[in-house]
Amino acid sequence: MAQIIDLVPWDECSAHLYASPAVLLPLERVRHPLAGVKHQLYHPALPSLRRMDMDTVKGCLSDEHCQSSTYFSKDDFNKAHFTLLGVPNKPLQCLDFTATGQKLCHKYRGGKMIPIAPGINRVDWPCFTRAIEDWSKFVSRSEEFKLPCANKRVEGFSGYAVRYLKPEVTQNWRYCLNQNPSLDRYGQKPLPFDSLNAFRRFGSHYSRINYLTPWH
């Protein structure tokens, strides 16, 4: 949005001999409380974690913080839409160009391949995945494997030391350290912001900050 300002005001009786210059000045955007305009889960312009952190460091109030306010109006939230991506119903046209693509086309036309997963336009959508059936078939087809020996106190996986939930008191302390980044059942935990800044501090608390002093 912009506002038009006329720089040359004219009288109603005066004769216009030249064009009046105009300047477009941007208007200040109005922030709305997020609770007053957002009534659904989807946010069309979700603020980034960096933007929220910057507003928190600046000490913005709730009517200026991007976590609790937005420039969008209620109509923008009601008209917002999104598209869920799915597997396309039609194969790519470039599959006939390469030998691998021709082989896949022949297998699919001959009925030797599993049919393509349903796309967005299918009636039975949403069917994101058949994970339960696939997992049961995978487990039933897999062979038996030997479990590790239970008498072994310390086990290592991919360079990580593991331990039992109830360790003995005499066990070595180094296995109590947490790896960084660490993992949980949902995946990798967020990395702390100061984990890479260990022993990397500009200057000292007890001396002058040298990196802010001009060298000339």
UniProtKB/Swiss-Prot annotation:
GO terms for cellular component: axonemal A tubule inner sheath; sperm flagellum. The keyword Cytoplasm applies. GO terms for biological process: flagellated sperm motility. It comes from the Eukaryota. Disulfide bonds: none annotated. Disruption phenotype: Deficient mice are viable and have normal fertility. Its main location: cytoplasm. The keyword Repeat does not apply. Expressed in testis. It is found in: Cytoplasm, Cytoskeleton, Flagellum axoneme. Keywords: Cell projection, Cilium, Cytoplasm, Cytoskeleton, Flagellum. Transmembrane segments: none annotated. Microtubule inner protein (MIP) part of the dynein-decorated doublet microtubules (DMTs) in flagellum axoneme. May serve to reinforce and thus stabilize the microtubule structure in the sperm flagella. Microtubule inner protein component of sperm flagellar doublet microtubules. This is Sperm microtubule inner protein 8. It comes from Mus musculus. The lineage of its organism: Eukaryota, Metazoa, Chordata, Craniata, Vertebrata.
